[in-house]
Protein backbone atom coordinates (compact mmCIF):
# COMPACT_ATOMS: atom_id res chain seq x y z
CA UNK A 1 0.00 0.00 0.00
CA UNK A 2 2.82 2.40 0.88
CA UNK A 3 4.45 1.67 -2.47
CA UNK A 4 1.21 2.45 -4.33
CA UNK A 5 0.71 5.67 -2.35
CA UNK A 6 4.25 6.78 -3.06
CA UNK A 7 3.78 6.01 -6.77
CA UNK A 8 0.52 7.98 -6.83
CA UNK A 9 2.21 10.93 -5.10
CA UNK A 10 5.14 10.94 -7.52
CA UNK A 11 2.78 10.63 -10.50
CA UNK A 12 0.66 13.57 -9.30
CA UNK A 13 3.66 15.79 -8.61
CA UNK A 14 5.08 14.96 -12.01
CA UNK A 15 1.82 15.87 -13.74
CA UNK A 16 1.57 19.08 -11.73
CA UNK A 17 5.08 20.06 -12.73
CA UNK A 18 4.28 19.49 -16.40
CA UNK A 19 1.08 21.55 -16.18
CA UNK A 20 2.82 24.41 -14.40
CA UNK A 21 5.61 24.41 -16.96
CA UNK A 22 3.05 24.57 -19.75
CA UNK A 23 1.18 27.57 -18.39
CA UNK A 24 4.11 29.54 -16.97
CA UNK A 25 5.69 32.25 -19.15
CA UNK A 26 8.77 30.98 -20.94
CA UNK A 27 12.04 32.16 -19.44
CA UNK A 28 15.43 30.86 -20.47
CA UNK A 29 19.00 32.02 -20.68
CA UNK A 30 21.61 30.56 -23.00
CA UNK A 31 24.23 33.31 -23.28
CA UNK A 32 24.94 36.90 -22.18
CA UNK A 33 23.07 39.71 -23.91
CA UNK A 34 24.98 40.70 -27.07
CA UNK A 35 25.78 44.25 -28.09
CA UNK A 36 23.88 45.23 -30.11
CA UNK A 37 20.90 43.02 -29.32
CA UNK A 38 17.72 42.68 -31.36
CA UNK A 39 14.64 42.60 -29.13
CA UNK A 40 11.60 40.73 -30.46
CA UNK A 41 8.22 40.39 -28.75
CA UNK A 42 6.23 37.17 -28.94
CA UNK A 43 2.55 37.92 -28.34
CA UNK A 44 1.69 34.24 -28.09
CA UNK A 45 4.41 33.42 -25.57
CA UNK A 46 4.06 36.71 -23.65
CA UNK A 47 7.83 36.95 -23.82
CA UNK A 48 10.69 39.14 -25.00
CA UNK A 49 13.30 37.32 -27.08
CA UNK A 50 16.84 38.70 -26.94
CA UNK A 51 18.48 37.87 -30.27
CA UNK A 52 22.13 37.84 -31.31
CA UNK A 53 22.08 39.47 -34.79
CA UNK A 54 25.38 37.79 -35.71
CA UNK A 55 24.09 34.24 -35.26
CA UNK A 56 20.34 34.98 -35.51
CA UNK A 57 19.89 32.85 -32.38
CA UNK A 58 17.76 33.68 -29.36
CA UNK A 59 20.05 33.95 -26.32
CA UNK A 60 17.28 34.54 -23.76
CA UNK A 61 13.52 34.75 -23.34
CA UNK A 62 12.03 36.91 -20.60
CA UNK A 63 8.31 37.04 -19.59
CA UNK A 64 6.70 40.45 -20.16
CA UNK A 65 3.04 40.06 -19.22
CA UNK A 66 -0.11 39.75 -21.27
CA UNK A 67 -0.50 41.01 -24.84
CA UNK A 68 2.89 42.67 -25.39
CA UNK A 69 2.80 44.84 -28.51
CA UNK A 70 5.71 47.29 -28.71
CA UNK A 71 9.16 47.44 -27.14
CA UNK A 72 11.80 50.13 -26.76
CA UNK A 73 15.23 50.15 -25.10
CA UNK A 74 16.83 52.78 -22.91
CA UNK A 75 19.63 54.87 -24.38
CA UNK A 76 22.27 52.88 -22.49
CA UNK A 77 20.81 49.58 -23.73
CA UNK A 78 20.38 48.20 -20.22
CA UNK A 79 16.58 48.28 -19.92
CA UNK A 80 13.64 47.38 -22.16
CA UNK A 81 10.10 48.72 -21.83
CA UNK A 82 7.12 46.81 -23.25
CA UNK A 83 3.55 48.05 -23.74
CA UNK A 84 0.82 45.67 -22.54
CA UNK A 85 -1.96 46.69 -24.89
CA UNK A 86 -5.03 44.48 -24.48
CA UNK A 87 -6.95 46.62 -27.00
CA UNK A 88 -7.62 49.11 -24.24
CA UNK A 89 -8.10 46.64 -21.38
CA UNK A 90 -4.61 46.88 -19.88
CA UNK A 91 -2.70 49.78 -18.33
CA UNK A 92 0.86 48.60 -17.69
CA UNK A 93 4.32 48.89 -19.19
CA UNK A 94 6.52 45.89 -18.46
CA UNK A 95 10.20 46.39 -17.66
CA UNK A 96 13.12 44.06 -18.40
CA UNK A 97 16.70 44.21 -17.13
CA UNK A 98 18.49 43.28 -20.36
CA UNK A 99 21.84 42.49 -18.76
CA UNK A 100 20.39 40.26 -16.04
CA UNK A 101 17.75 39.01 -18.51
CA UNK A 102 15.11 39.29 -15.80
CA UNK A 103 11.71 41.03 -15.52
CA UNK A 104 11.38 43.97 -13.15
CA UNK A 105 8.22 45.40 -11.54
CA UNK A 106 5.71 46.72 -14.06
CA UNK A 107 4.87 50.40 -14.41
CA UNK A 108 1.17 50.95 -13.64
CA UNK A 109 -0.33 53.73 -15.77
CA UNK A 110 -3.53 53.86 -13.70
CA UNK A 111 -6.44 55.14 -15.79
CA UNK A 112 -4.33 55.45 -18.96
CA UNK A 113 -5.58 52.30 -20.65
CA UNK A 114 -4.39 50.78 -23.89
CA UNK A 115 -0.67 51.69 -23.98
CA UNK A 116 0.81 50.91 -27.37
CA UNK A 117 3.40 53.02 -29.21
CA UNK A 118 6.66 53.68 -27.36
CA UNK A 119 9.76 55.87 -27.64
CA UNK A 120 12.70 56.47 -25.32
CA UNK A 121 14.03 60.04 -25.48
CA UNK A 122 15.92 62.13 -22.92
CA UNK A 123 15.47 59.70 -20.06
CA UNK A 124 11.72 59.34 -20.52
CA UNK A 125 9.52 56.54 -21.84
CA UNK A 126 6.96 58.16 -24.13
CA UNK A 127 3.78 56.23 -24.86
CA UNK A 128 0.37 56.34 -26.48
CA UNK A 129 -2.71 55.27 -24.50
CA UNK A 130 -5.44 54.50 -27.02
CA UNK A 131 -8.43 54.02 -24.76
CA UNK A 132 -7.64 57.22 -22.85
CA UNK A 133 -6.97 59.20 -26.05
CA UNK A 134 -3.72 60.56 -24.68
CA UNK A 135 0.03 60.45 -25.02
CA UNK A 136 2.29 60.64 -22.01
CA UNK A 137 5.71 59.99 -20.57
CA UNK A 138 7.23 58.09 -17.68
CA UNK A 139 10.38 59.20 -15.88
CA UNK A 140 12.77 56.26 -16.23
CA UNK A 141 14.32 57.00 -12.84
CA UNK A 142 11.20 57.18 -10.68
CA UNK A 143 9.15 55.08 -13.12
CA UNK A 144 6.18 57.36 -12.53
CA UNK A 145 4.03 59.15 -15.10
CA UNK A 146 5.26 62.75 -15.31
CA UNK A 147 3.38 64.19 -18.30
CA UNK A 148 0.07 63.64 -20.13
CA UNK A 149 -1.40 65.32 -23.21
CA UNK A 150 -4.81 64.61 -24.72
CA UNK A 151 -5.07 63.94 -28.45
CA UNK A 152 -8.82 64.08 -29.07
CA UNK A 153 -8.31 61.40 -31.72
CA UNK A 154 -9.48 57.80 -32.01
CA UNK A 155 -6.88 55.04 -31.57
CA UNK A 156 -3.75 57.12 -31.16
CA UNK A 157 -1.49 54.17 -31.93
CA UNK A 158 2.15 54.89 -32.79
CA UNK A 159 4.47 57.69 -31.64
CA UNK A 160 7.67 59.37 -32.78
CA UNK A 161 9.52 61.79 -30.49
CA UNK A 162 12.26 64.02 -31.90
CA UNK A 163 15.65 63.78 -30.14
CA UNK A 164 15.18 67.13 -28.37
CA UNK A 165 11.67 66.10 -27.21
CA UNK A 166 10.28 69.38 -28.56
CA UNK A 167 8.18 67.80 -31.31
CA UNK A 168 6.05 64.64 -31.32
CA UNK A 169 4.13 62.86 -34.08
CA UNK A 170 1.38 60.27 -33.65
CA UNK A 171 -0.82 58.23 -35.97
CA UNK A 172 -4.51 58.02 -35.10
CA UNK A 173 -5.88 54.92 -36.81
CA UNK A 174 -9.66 55.30 -36.65
CA UNK A 175 -9.58 59.07 -37.11
CA UNK A 176 -7.43 58.68 -40.25
CA UNK A 177 -5.14 61.47 -39.06
CA UNK A 178 -1.61 62.31 -37.98
CA UNK A 179 -1.03 64.73 -35.11
CA UNK A 180 2.00 67.01 -34.77
CA UNK A 181 2.65 68.33 -31.25
CA UNK A 182 5.11 71.21 -30.89
CA UNK A 183 6.42 72.45 -27.56
CA UNK A 184 6.16 76.20 -27.11
CA UNK A 185 6.49 78.81 -24.40
CA UNK A 186 3.65 80.84 -25.95
CA UNK A 187 0.56 78.79 -26.85
CA UNK A 188 -1.03 79.72 -30.16
CA UNK A 189 -4.18 81.80 -30.01
CA UNK A 190 -3.55 83.26 -26.55
CA UNK A 191 -3.65 87.03 -26.84
CA UNK A 192 -3.90 89.57 -24.05
CA UNK A 193 -7.56 90.57 -23.60
CA UNK A 194 -8.48 94.22 -23.19
CA UNK A 195 -8.58 95.25 -19.55
CA UNK A 196 -11.94 96.30 -18.13
CA UNK A 197 -10.70 97.93 -14.97
CA UNK A 198 -7.78 98.12 -12.59
CA UNK A 199 -8.53 94.71 -11.05
CA UNK A 200 -9.99 92.94 -14.12
CA UNK A 201 -8.49 89.49 -14.63
CA UNK A 202 -10.44 88.17 -17.59
CA UNK A 203 -12.82 85.21 -17.79
CA UNK A 204 -10.87 82.09 -16.95
CA UNK A 205 -7.62 83.46 -18.40
CA UNK A 206 -4.25 83.87 -16.70
CA UNK A 207 -3.69 87.22 -14.95
CA UNK A 208 -2.55 89.82 -17.49
CA UNK A 209 0.40 90.96 -15.35
CA UNK A 210 1.40 94.55 -14.66
CA UNK A 211 -0.65 97.19 -16.43
CA UNK A 212 1.01 98.46 -19.55
CA UNK A 213 3.04 95.29 -20.10
CA UNK A 214 2.56 94.15 -23.69
CA UNK A 215 2.50 90.68 -25.22
CA UNK A 216 0.47 87.57 -24.48
CA UNK A 217 -0.11 86.29 -20.96
CA UNK A 218 2.40 83.82 -19.60
CA UNK A 219 1.80 80.17 -20.42
CA UNK A 220 1.77 77.31 -17.93
CA UNK A 221 4.99 76.33 -16.14
CA UNK A 222 7.28 74.43 -18.51
CA UNK A 223 5.54 75.81 -21.57
CA UNK A 224 2.67 74.36 -23.56
CA UNK A 225 2.06 72.31 -26.69
CA UNK A 226 0.50 73.35 -29.98
CA UNK A 227 -1.38 70.61 -31.81
CA UNK A 228 -1.91 70.26 -35.56
CA UNK A 229 -4.14 67.46 -36.87
CA UNK A 230 -3.48 66.40 -40.48
CA UNK A 231 -5.99 64.22 -42.40
CA UNK A 232 -4.37 61.25 -44.16
CA UNK A 233 -5.64 57.93 -45.51
CA UNK A 234 -7.85 55.47 -43.67
CA UNK A 235 -6.23 53.20 -41.12
CA UNK A 236 -3.15 55.36 -40.61
CA UNK A 237 -0.91 53.26 -38.40
CA UNK A 238 2.70 52.48 -39.25
CA UNK A 239 4.88 55.51 -39.96
CA UNK A 240 8.40 56.84 -39.73
CA UNK A 241 10.27 60.13 -39.94
CA UNK A 242 13.14 60.53 -42.40
CA UNK A 243 16.60 60.70 -40.79
CA UNK A 244 16.83 64.42 -41.66
CA UNK A 245 13.57 65.06 -39.80
CA UNK A 246 11.88 66.73 -42.76
CA UNK A 247 9.25 64.20 -43.84
CA UNK A 248 6.94 61.63 -42.32
CA UNK A 249 5.67 58.72 -44.40
CA UNK A 250 2.43 57.14 -43.17
CA UNK A 251 1.14 53.72 -44.26
CA UNK A 252 -2.66 53.73 -44.55
CA UNK A 253 -3.87 50.17 -44.08
CA UNK A 254 -7.47 50.61 -45.24
CA UNK A 255 -6.85 52.10 -48.67
CA UNK A 256 -3.30 50.86 -49.29
CA UNK A 257 -1.80 54.33 -49.79
CA UNK A 258 1.18 56.12 -48.28
CA UNK A 259 0.82 59.74 -47.18
CA UNK A 260 3.96 61.88 -47.41
CA UNK A 261 3.92 64.77 -44.92
CA UNK A 262 6.11 67.87 -44.98
CA UNK A 263 6.63 68.26 -41.23
CA UNK A 264 7.61 71.94 -41.30
CA UNK A 265 4.66 72.84 -43.56
CA UNK A 266 2.34 70.50 -41.63
CA UNK A 267 0.60 69.18 -44.72
CA UNK A 268 0.42 66.16 -47.01
CA UNK A 269 2.53 66.80 -50.11
CA UNK A 270 2.00 63.46 -51.87
CA UNK A 271 -0.21 60.38 -51.69
CA UNK A 272 1.44 57.27 -53.09
CA UNK A 273 -0.80 54.61 -54.60
CA UNK A 274 1.25 51.87 -52.96
CA UNK A 275 -1.19 48.94 -53.22
CA UNK A 276 -0.33 48.17 -49.61
CA UNK A 277 -3.67 47.24 -48.05
CA UNK A 278 -3.25 45.95 -44.55
CA UNK A 279 0.04 47.82 -44.21
CA UNK A 280 1.16 47.53 -40.62
CA UNK A 281 4.57 49.20 -40.33
CA UNK A 282 6.85 51.51 -42.33
CA UNK A 283 10.54 52.13 -41.68
CA UNK A 284 13.33 54.10 -43.37
CA UNK A 285 16.82 52.74 -43.88
CA UNK A 286 19.45 54.54 -41.75
CA UNK A 287 20.69 56.52 -44.77
CA UNK A 288 17.14 57.59 -45.64
CA UNK A 289 17.36 56.31 -49.21
CA UNK A 290 14.65 53.65 -48.96
CA UNK A 291 11.45 52.92 -47.08
CA UNK A 292 10.20 49.43 -46.29
CA UNK A 293 6.52 48.66 -45.70
CA UNK A 294 5.14 45.43 -44.22
CA UNK A 295 1.74 44.61 -45.67
CA UNK A 296 0.26 41.16 -45.10
CA UNK A 297 2.59 38.58 -46.67
CA UNK A 298 4.67 41.20 -48.45
CA UNK A 299 7.46 43.67 -47.87
CA UNK A 300 7.39 46.61 -50.29
CA UNK A 301 10.54 48.65 -50.90
CA UNK A 302 10.34 52.30 -52.04
CA UNK A 303 12.96 54.73 -53.28
CA UNK A 304 12.50 57.80 -51.10
CA UNK A 305 13.84 60.36 -53.58
CA UNK A 306 11.63 59.23 -56.48
CA UNK A 307 8.77 57.93 -54.27
CA UNK A 308 8.61 54.89 -56.56
CA UNK A 309 8.37 51.20 -55.73
CA UNK A 310 11.69 49.38 -56.13
CA UNK A 311 10.76 45.82 -55.25
CA UNK A 312 7.97 43.75 -53.74
CA UNK A 313 8.94 40.64 -51.79
CA UNK A 314 6.37 37.97 -50.94
CA UNK A 315 7.78 36.33 -47.83
CA UNK A 316 5.12 34.93 -45.53
CA UNK A 317 1.44 34.03 -45.52
CA UNK A 318 0.27 37.15 -43.70
CA UNK A 319 0.46 39.19 -40.58
CA UNK A 320 3.46 41.27 -41.56
CA UNK A 321 4.31 43.36 -38.50
CA UNK A 322 7.25 45.11 -36.88
CA UNK A 323 10.24 46.33 -38.90
CA UNK A 324 13.71 47.20 -37.65
CA UNK A 325 16.82 48.26 -39.53
CA UNK A 326 20.23 47.03 -38.44
CA UNK A 327 22.15 50.06 -37.12
CA UNK A 328 24.88 49.61 -39.76
CA UNK A 329 22.27 49.64 -42.53
CA UNK A 330 23.08 46.19 -43.90
CA UNK A 331 19.93 44.29 -42.99
CA UNK A 332 16.24 44.73 -42.27
CA UNK A 333 14.21 42.55 -39.91
CA UNK A 334 10.48 42.04 -40.51
CA UNK A 335 8.15 40.07 -38.23
CA UNK A 336 5.55 37.74 -39.77
CA UNK A 337 3.01 36.87 -37.09
CA UNK A 338 1.09 34.14 -38.92
CA UNK A 339 4.27 32.35 -39.93
CA UNK A 340 5.96 32.67 -36.56
CA UNK A 341 9.29 34.02 -37.75
CA UNK A 342 11.26 37.21 -38.32
CA UNK A 343 12.59 37.51 -41.87
CA UNK A 344 16.10 38.89 -42.36
CA UNK A 345 16.53 40.94 -45.57
CA UNK A 346 19.87 41.93 -47.10
CA UNK A 347 19.39 45.60 -47.97
CA UNK A 348 21.96 45.46 -50.78
CA UNK A 349 20.42 42.54 -52.67
CA UNK A 350 16.87 42.93 -51.29
CA UNK A 351 16.69 39.18 -50.74
CA UNK A 352 15.76 37.15 -47.67
CA UNK A 353 18.96 35.75 -46.16
CA UNK A 354 17.66 34.23 -42.93
CA UNK A 355 14.82 33.68 -40.50
CA UNK A 356 14.64 33.97 -36.72
CA UNK A 357 12.43 31.78 -34.53
CA UNK A 358 11.62 34.30 -31.83
CA UNK A 359 8.40 32.69 -30.58
CA UNK A 360 4.77 32.56 -31.63
CA UNK A 361 3.12 35.61 -33.17
CA UNK A 362 6.21 37.87 -33.29
CA UNK A 363 5.58 41.59 -33.74
CA UNK A 364 7.18 44.56 -31.97
CA UNK A 365 10.96 44.90 -32.20
CA UNK A 366 13.72 47.26 -31.09
CA UNK A 367 17.49 47.52 -30.83
CA UNK A 368 19.41 47.67 -27.56
CA UNK A 369 22.87 49.22 -27.89
CA UNK A 370 24.85 49.05 -24.67
CA UNK A 371 26.79 52.16 -23.67
Regions found by a protein language model. Name each.
Residues 10-14, 18-371:
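Predominantly soluble domains enriched in secretory-pathway, periplasmic, or organellar proteins
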Residues 1-6:
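N-terminal secretory signal peptides that target proteins for export/translocation
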